C-alpha cells in the first residue's frame, strides 16, 4: 500500500514561540501520566524490594521513554494531525516546534531513558523499555496505524508494557503477575480506542486512517467493543484468583466491570448520536485508573521498601 503521508506546509517556524510547555505537550503528557501510574503499580506489585531512589529513576526512565515515543509519533503523524480537529493544536502543527527538532528531541530523550534504565536499574527493564519505544514507533505508528484495521489491537502491545517494565525494574523478571497486568491494559485498549473512533469517525475518514468504524461500520465496531468488554471483565478478576490481590479487589473490580459491561451494552443498543460513545470513553479512563489503584491498594504480595 502506498504511503498516506501528505505533503503539508506548516508555515514558518517561530522559535521564539517555543516554550517548555510545548515540549511537554510534544511528549503527550496525558499518556505519560497513565504510563507512570501503571508502571509504578507494576513496581509495587513485584514480590521484591528496591531502594526508593532506584524506583524513582525507573519511573523517570519509563516516563521519558513514553515521552520520546510520543514525540516521534507526532513527528511522523504531523500530516494527519493537521487534518484532525482533536490534534490540530499539537506543537508541530501549530508551528512552534520544527519537525526535525521534534524528531531529534524524541531520539535523544529515548536514548537517555534506555541508557539510564540499563545503568541504574537493570538490563531487562532497559530492554523492555527499548522494545516498547521501538514497537510504538515502528510497528504501530509507521506500519499498522495507516494500513490495518487491527492497528489498535496489535499496536496496543506497547501501551500495555509499562507495568511489565515496572515489575521487571524491581524483580528483574517477567512473571504471571506482570503478564496479567499487561493483559488488562491490552484488552482494555481496543474498546477504549474504538469508542473514541466512533465520535471522531469523520476525522479518521478525512485522513484515511483505517479505524474500525470507518472501515467496518458502527454496528460491527460496537459488537467488538462488547466482546472485548466481556474479555476484560474476565481478565480483570484474575489478580484475585492467582493470589495477587485480596477479596476486596474481587468485589470492587467486579462492580467496576459490571458497570463497564453496562456502558458497552448501552453503546451497542444506542441508535442516537455519539453521546453514549463519549460516556463509554470517559468511563473507560476512570475504569483503568481505578482498577490499577485497586491493584496497588489491595495487593497481598509486597511493597517497595
UniProtKB/Swiss-Prot annotation:
Its EC number is 2.5.1.141. One of its GO terms (molecular function) is protoheme IX farnesyltransferase activity. InterPro entries: Protohaem_IX_farnesylTrfase (IPR006369), UbiA_prenyltransferase (IPR000537), UbiA_prenylTrfase_CS (IPR030470), UbiA_sf (IPR044878). It is a multi-pass membrane protein. Keywords: Cell inner membrane, Cell membrane, Heme biosynthesis, Membrane, Transferase, Transmembrane, Transmembrane helix. It comes from the Bacteria. Coiled coil: none annotated. Pathway: Porphyrin-containing compound metabolism; heme O biosynthesis; heme O from protoheme: step 1/1. Carbon 2 of the heme B porphyrin ring is defined according to the Fischer nomenclature. This is Protoheme IX farnesyltransferase. It comes from Rickettsia massiliae (strain Mtu5). The lineage of its organism: Bacteria, Pseudomonadati, Pseudomonadota, Alphaproteobacteria, Rickettsiales.
